[in-house]
Design a protein with these regions (language model features):
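Non-catalytic tandem-repeat scaffold regions and their flanking low-complexity/translocation tails
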Residues: 22-601
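Bacterial N-terminal signal peptides
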Residues: 8-19
Length: 601
């Protein structure tokens, strides 16, 4: 009976039902010494979170909590975990049917949301691959049935399916290589995308021979596909970071540092292109228009861009490549040839200094083009210029709506660069020039983190951390500001646990003031939007989330952090943070023979 009473107390602390928050009181600043973290309690807390999801209004948040809880329960109560996963999958299917993936707007930029069906499948695959495969087969069958009732194919849906399958495959690489490759193979039924090359490079870092073998399977699958799809297989054999064609979607691939190109794969790929060229020459009317340019133009681009590498590694094929390219050229219009040569020329434009770019921009009579070029010069070519010189150029931009976002972007990047060079004073000085206070506070937190890594004395470390709190107090309530405060709380755990708890309380207050606070996205978008051009980049803000910092402090102060988690006004965030604390308890109980979650201070 006593044990049951104690569990009930813990559940009330966690505020598992939709009712009342216990956070009306002043935040605690003293560390509780009570040891109440026990294995059975942690499991009870997790199961209460599953029950609490029934009160959520947002299906996406409900799915997130169910998946997290099921993942934690699997090793302890598999039947309950399966039930939670099944509920999450049913909700995800309903959510997708009603809303699809959904799009979020960042100015003029649209950002696609996650497909929660595959989020659930991804998590299940870590525990039961066969079950996850059955769920994928179920989705693909439904997709096929739906497509058969439509007069035209949904090409975009097919691409997204391939991307989702490859995302699952990538997540499984370190856990179950065979399962990973199985999911990757299932993607070959759908159009190739840049996700395929990204998977190949990631897989090669785990098992190069397996990745090379899968490449051959992919090449066979896409041998007769439109050139803009086949050319997604152009980068991997040569170890290139870009595709050789004009692709529907493109990126710069992260090639593993120790990656070694495979001449055999290079030969197979070049021979495939030569076969396609010959087919075109034999039957010029049998070509695919392509999303951007027709197949023959894609062939010409690929053979031209890979020419030097082919001469170096496959000299015996170089003559055939030259003949093939000439054959394609002869069948292209003069206008197409000019456009293609222009594309090749833009691959490696002549290098111009910052001042040369500025001078050229200022001569342009079109004010919008001039502003665009000046902005580009500041962002991408001013690395070695003095701050004062760059500021003089920014002043020449006509559109006042561009100047301040550009300055924030410039000083943010300069501060980060100084931080990488361990010039902490310069980094702080530059950060003060960032007028977006939440981003300034985030920069301060990164500077403090690096300084503490290098054993800065506690007095200066405390000064830096308090500077962040002061800057955050003046900043608008955003997830960037909240992450900065969370960073301070985390960093304070190294020097002053009481202060860590107090700052954690401030972070929670900040989060509660943010409408629809979402910490699942590990980046924020910064943007410059002129009248006729837009530029976007992401700031990576990963590492500091409410659940991770609360769990970190819970290793010392379980009861207090469980109480702090109850203060979140958002039900799903309250549940996610509580689950993270319970997970910490499970790990501690397992490693410490249920001695609790305290550690020496």
């Amino acid at each position: 009976m006593q044990r049951q009473s104690r569990i009930t107390t813990l559940l009330l602390l966690a505020v598992m039902t939709c009712g009342v928050s216990l956070a009306q009181d002043t935040p605690q600043t003293e560390i509780s010494r009570q040891i109440t973290c026990k294995y059975e309690d942690a499991l009870a807390i997790i199961e209460q979170q599953v029950d609490a999801t029934k009160t959520f209004d947002d299906d996406a948040r409900r799915i997130e909590v169910l998946v997290r809880a099921a993942d934690l329960l699997w090793s302890h109560k598999e039947a309950n975990a399966r039930k939670a996963y099944s509920e999450a999958f049913a909700l995800a299917k309903r959510h997708f049917k009603e809303k699809g993936e959904g799009l979020e707007q960042e100015g003029r930029l649209s950002i696609r949301g996650p497909d929660h069906r595959y989020v659930v499948i991804n998590s299940i695959a870590r525990h039961d691959v066969n079950w996850s495969k059955k769920l994928v087969a179920e989705l693909l069958k439904e997709q096929e049935d739906e497509a058969s009732s439509k007069p035209t194919k949904d090409a975009q849906q097919a691409e997204r399916t391939a991307e989702r399958l490859l995302t699952v495959a990538t997540s499984l690489l370190s856990l179950d290589e065979a399962a990973s490759l199985s999911f990757a193979r299932s993607s070959l039924k759908f159009p190739a995308t840049m996700f395929l090359t990204e998977f190949l490079y990631t897989a090669s870092a785990h098992n190069k021979s397996a990745a090379d073998q899968f490449y051959q399977e992919a090449l066979a699958a896409y041998l007769n596909a439109p050139m803009e799809r086949l050319l997604y297989l152009s980068a991997y054999p040569f170890g290139n970071n870009r595709d050789a064609g004009d692709m529907p979607g493109h990126t710069i691939y992260q090639v593993p540092t120790d990656f070694t190109p495979n001449p055999n794969l290079q030969r197979l790929f070049v021979q495939a292109i030569l076969q396609r060229v010959q087919r075109f020459i034999d039957n010029p009317s049998d070509v695919t228009a392509g999303t951007r340019i027709p197949d023959p133009e894609e062939m010409w681009l690929a053979l031209t861009r890979l020419e030097k590498q082919i001469h170096k590694s496959l000299p015996d094929l170089a003559p055939a490549v030259e003949v093939a390219r000439n054959g394609v050229t002869a069948r292209l219009s003069q206008e197409s040839q000019r456009e293609l040569r222009g594309r090749i020329g833009s691959d490696n434009p002549p290098s111009r200094t910052f001042d040369e770019q500025v001078e050229s921009a200022l001569k342009n009579p079109n004010v919008n083009t001039r502003d665009h070029r000046l902005t580009s010069a500041v962002l991408y070519s001013s690395k070695n210029e003095s701050v004062d010189h760059v500021l003089q150029v920014v002043d020449k931009i006509s559109d006042s709506n561009i100047r301040q976002p550009l300055l924030n972007w410039f000083f943010f990047d300069r501060s980060q660069r100084a931080l990488k060079e361990q010039k902490f004073d310069d980094a702080r000085r530059l950060a003060t020039r960032v007028e977006e206070l939440d981003q300034r506070a985030f920069l301060y937190s990164q500077i403090a983190k690096e300084a503490l890594k290098r054993n800065a004395d506690q007095t200066s470390a405390r000064e830096m951390l308090e500077d962040i709190v002061d800057a955050a107090a003046k900043a608008p309530n955003t997830t960037v500001k909240a992450r900065a405060l969370l960073a301070v709380a985390s960093l304070y755990t190294r020097i002053d646990m009481n202060r860590a708890v107090a700052v954690m309380a401030e972070a929670i207050e900040c989060v509660n003031r943010i409408e629809h606070a979402d910490f699942t996205r590990q980046f924020v978008i910064r943007k410059i939007e002129g009248k006729h051009f837009s530029m976007y980049a992401s700031i990576v803000t990963s590492g500091y989330k409410p659940e991770t910092v609360l769990a970190e402090i819970a290793a010392v102060d379980f009861d207090n952090m469980l109480n702090q988690a109850s203060r979140f006004s958002d039900k799903s965030l309250r549940a996610i943070t509580t689950l993270a604390i319970a997970e910490r308890c499970l790990k501690s109980a397992r490693s410490g023979s249920q001695k609790g979650a305290t550690r020496p201070r």
